[in-house]
């Protein structure tokens, strides 16, 4: 089983996760969002993928939609890669469903931050 975590702040995740991949788990600077594959939550040992959105990047409207779509594809590819699940340009229905589910999860989390005032 793999989990998806979505955060809107590096501060919320920096001490709670570690990578079991071949990269350093660190803040990625000036970008709208970053997907961290092969991530493990320290407290539970659960493994999955983490997306961290940078809500200080002044993203709005269509830029949020673009970023969610972009990161959703990264998440789907990371999960399929780790679980050795293949898809191609003709046999991609399962990938489309996973990308849609990831996008919905992102939007649920982002709404809390966008409409908090």
Q: What positions do the PLM features span?
A:
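Post-HExxH zinc-binding segment in Zn-dependent metallohydrolases
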Residues: 86-117
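Active-site scaffold of zinc-dependent metalloenzymes
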Residues: 19-62, 75-78
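Catalytic Zn2+-binding segment of zinc metalloproteases
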Residues: 72-88
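Acidic, glycine-rich loop-and-strand cores that form catalytic or ligand-binding grooves
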Residues: 1-21
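Short alpha-helical catalytic segment bearing the HExxH-like zincin motif
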Residues: 63-71
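Residue-level detector of short, conserved catalytic/binding motifs and their immediate flanks
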Residues: 49, 65, 94
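Short, flexible coil/linker elements and helix-boundary hinge sites characteristic
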Residues: 18, 22, 82-84, 113-116
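Short, solvent-exposed segments of well-ordered alpha helices
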Residues: 59, 63, 87-90
């Amino acid at each position: 089983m793999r989990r998806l975590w979505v955060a809107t702040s590096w501060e919320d995740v920096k001490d709670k996760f570690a990578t079991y991949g071949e990269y350093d788990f660190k803040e990625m600077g000036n970008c709208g969002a970053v997907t961290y594959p092969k991530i493990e939550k320290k407290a539970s040992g659960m493994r999955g993928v983490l997306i961290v959105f940078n809500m200080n990047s002044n993203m709005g409207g269509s830029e949020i939609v673009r970023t969610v779509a972009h990161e959703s594809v990264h998440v789907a590819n990371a999960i399929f890669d780790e679980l050795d699940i293949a898809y191609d340009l003709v046999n991609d229905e399962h990938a489309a469903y996973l990308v849609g589910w990831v996008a919905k999860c992102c939007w649920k989390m982002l709404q809390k931050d966008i409409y908090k005032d």
